[in-house]
C-alpha cells in the first residue's frame, strides 16, 4: 500500500470514529503531536484519547481531504476540513449543538512496511473555539470541566 493510500485509509477511519483501526495502522512506538493543544506523546495514549473524544463529541463527523501529497521521505501531508455538529463536550467546551468546520493540516510519517510512525496535526484552536460558540476564553461559564 502506498503512503497516499494509507493516509486516505487513516482519514476514513477518523471520519468513522474507528480509533482501534487507526491504532492498528501505527507502529507500537508511534508518536503524536497535536500542536494546537500542545499535546505530544504516544499515539496509543494521547492520539487515541483525542480521536475518541472527537468521535464522541461529533458522531456525524465528516473529513474531507482537500489536498494530499507524499514527500520523498514517505511523509503523507494532508490538508483536510473536518465538520460536524457538536453532540457532547469537546476539549472542555460545553455542548451547544453547534455545527462547525475547521481546516487542519496533518503529517503522517510512513515506514517502509506501511505503518505510521508519527502523526503531527495543526489547526487554529481559537477558530475552533469560535466555531463552537465560545465568545470569551476567560468566561468559565462557557466551558465545562
Predicted feature descriptions by range:
Residues 1, 5, 41-45, 95-96:
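Residues at secondary-structure transition points
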Residues 1-25, 29:
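Short acidic-aromatic low-complexity motifs
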Residues 2, 55-145:
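A beta-strand edge to alpha-helix "cap/lid" segment located at domain peripheries
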Residues 20-21, 27-76:
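A solvent-exposed, acidic/Ser-Thr-rich amphipathic alpha-helical stretch
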